[in-house]
Amino acid sequence: MSRRCELTGKGVQVGNNVSHANNKTKRRFLPNLNDVTLMSETLGRGFKLRISAAALRTVDHRGGLDSFLAKAKDAELSEKALKIKKDIAKAQAAA
């Protein structure tokens, strides 16, 4: 399972621990990923996604999964999220 947010593309970053004596050792900064189920109002069902806590706040701020995906760039989304975005667009066009 990859350590990458399915909605924002946020992943692992690399940096240094720096001691008081200024010794540097490599370390990894891991994203705060959570397994959540987000509801789509258009499709009327939930989708299980692995997203960062920041992405969860952003989805809530933008008014839900449907509106978040409508504004999201395709390059940042995972294959699963892209499929959901296309299904939502198709359902909205049919309605």
Curated annotation (Swiss-Prot):
Tree of life domain: Bacteria
Organism of provenance: Dinoroseobacter shibae (strain DSM 16493 / NCIMB 14021 / DFL 12)
UniProt record similarity statement: Belongs to the bacterial ribosomal protein bL28 family.
Lineage, broadest ranks: Bacteria, Pseudomonadati, Pseudomonadota, Alphaproteobacteria, Rhodobacterales
Pfam family, one: Ribosomal_L28
UniProt xrefs under InterPro entries: Ribosomal_bL28, Ribosomal_bL28/bL31-like_sf, Ribosomal_bL28_bact-type, Ribosomal_bL28_sf
GO molecular function, one term: structural constituent of ribosome
Protein name: Large ribosomal subunit protein bL28
Keywords: Ribonucleoprotein, Ribosomal protein
Gene that encodes the chain: rpmB
Gene Ontology terms describing biological process: translation
